[in-house]
UniProtKB/Swiss-Prot annotation:
Function summary: Involved in transcription antitermination. Required for transcription of ribosomal RNA (rRNA) genes. Binds specifically to the boxA antiterminator sequence of the ribosomal RNA (rrn) operons.
Record Pfam families: NusB (PF01029)
Taxonomic superkingdom: Bacteria
One cellular component term from this protein's GO annotations in UniProt: cytosol
Lineage: Bacteria, Bacillati, Bacillota, Bacilli, Lactobacillales
InterPro entries (UniProt xref): NusB-like_sf, NusB_fam, NusB_RsmB_TIM44
Family according to the record: Belongs to the NusB family.
Gene3D superfamilies: NusB-like
GO terms of molecular function: RNA binding
Protein known as: Transcription antitermination protein NusB
Biological process per Gene Ontology, one example term: transcription antitermination
Length: 139
């Protein structure tokens, strides 16, 4: 089973969403359920899936601190939809810690995740936040 990076990001989002609800869940078992729902033989977990999920979890406090300044004064991380926050964490992680993912790709993939797992308002919100990030990086 060979997954594209886009599919891996979708699985990473699903894993992080599940781990948000149950932080003590076993990551590897969760990966197996996401990758092989029929529970036949164990499948090899793509390295990039593990990198994203483990990285976002390990750097969550740092990522949240980086996201907060891009929110309007009326918003805090606690007010964000969990889907939006998880997608932003993945994007910020890729932007900061994954060298072989161009900024444009990280932003586009975050918007695609929002289209798949959230609504149009969330897509506009995530796009706006990441647009500010890109503008800041250019300056």
């Amino acid at each position: 089973m060979s997954l594209t990076r886009h599919e891996i990001r979708e699985k990473a989002f699903q894993a992080l969403f599940a781990l948000n609800a149950n932080p003590d869940a076993d990551e590897n078992q969760l990966f197996q359920q996401l990758l092989n729902p029929e529970e036949t033989d164990a499948v090899e977990i793509p390295a990039y899936l593990s990198t994203l999920v483990t990285g976002v979890r390990e750097h969550q406090v740092e990522l949240d601190a980086q996201i907060q300044p891009y929110l309007s004064q009326k918003w805090s991380l606690d007010r964000l939809a969990k889907t939006d926050l998880i997608i932003l964490r993945i994007a910020f992680f890729e932007l900061q810690f994954v060298d072989d993912v161009p900024t444009k790709v990280a932003v586009n993939e975050a918007i695609e995740l929002t289209k798949a797992f959230s609504d149009d308002r969330s897509r506009k919100f995530v796009s706006g936040v990441l647009g500010k990030v890109v503008k800041n990086q250019a300056n």
